[in-house]
Each structure stands twice: as structure tokens, then as C-alpha cells.
Amino acid sequence: MFYTNVQPFGNFIALRGVDHNGVSFQKKLRYEPTLFVQSSKPQDPQWKTLDGKRVAGVKWGSMKETKEAVRQYGGEVFGLDQFQYSYISDNYPGMVNYDLARIKIAFIDIECSSEFGFPNIRQANEEVLAISIKMGDDFKTYACGDYDPPPHVRYIKCINEEQLLTEFINDWASNYPDIVTGWNSRFFDIPYLMNRIVRILGEKAANKLSPWGWFRENEVS
């Protein structure tokens, strides 16, 4: 059993992984993190900071309650404030034995028009002409117009960009990958595709790309 993704979700941990039977799962779990404060009690466990201060573990309730308690606490508080890592440490100690055969890896590539020059990622101003995605032995290409694909590629012919994006989203949501990769996908394909979907179909449609039904923007460099 191993995890593939752990994210904070309000007072919950959003967990995706593979169980002992090799089946993918996802669930939301309540989690109360442990942080550490200075202690002079001799009976406390021998936890120490890097500079030698003796500390004891404390629980202040839910993740939101813990963050509020840290703000109000008068002294130093030690530990991770990104609680997804605390959850991993608590529930998956030691080395995690991953089975790569059970991890769904999607390779993605998009093609855009360039009528007005190179597409602007933020504005998503150019039409998406094609999307190709390969996951395991399943290789699909979504596009408009006639195309004679190689034997190993399934071609989904669409009448316009709106249908192309919709077909892609529906297939994606029927079998969410664990890892998404591709050439320059982090800096172009994924952010451009997300912004283009929001522009053409709306944010509700873009939310379907997430197994949890929501997404947030991050600056990458």
C-alpha cells in the first residue's frame, strides 16, 4: 500500500494511493497534526530541536484549529506547518515501497494555433488544435478534421474546439492519472490547457480535471 498524492483540504487530508490489493483509491480523512513546544518536564519523551532544546508534542485539534493556536501561542512552536508532510510521516514511516506498474502515468502534448504569434499562457488566446495523451498502452489524439492515425493510436475526431476540450475532459475524468508529464508540460501545456478550458468552457469544466473537483493556481519557475 502506498500514497501517490497527499494534499490539505480544509480540515481534511485529501489522500490518493494504491491499496494492498493494487486498487487505486482516494478519500478525505480528518487529521489532527502534532507540533512541538519547549518543555522542562523530565518525564517527557527525549525530543530535542537541532539546537538542543527539549520539546514535547502537543495536539491542538483540527488543522485549522492548530494554525490558529500557533498564531496565539506565546512561545516558539516547532514542527511542520505544511501538514500533508506530517500526515505522510505519521502514516507512511520509513521507505515507501512503490510499485511503478500500479502508478498511472499520463504523457500529454497539445498543439495550438499561432495566428497571433506564440500563445500567451495567461490569456490562453489561441485555439487548441489537438491534444495527445498516452497512459499505459492507451494512446489517444483529439483533434478536428480528417486524420489517419497509426494502428496504436485512437483518434477522436471532433467538430470544433469546444467538443475537443469536452471529450478530453470527460475521458480524463473517467480515469485520473497519478502523474502527468510531457515535454515542457509544466511550463506550457498544462497551464495553457487549464486557462484555455476556463476561457472556453468555464471554471466548472476545468474543475473536472481534478479528482477532487477543484484546483488552485501556483506560480512556477
Q: What are these language model-derived features?
A:
Residues 1-221:
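The two-metal-ion catalytic cores of nucleic-acid processing enzymes
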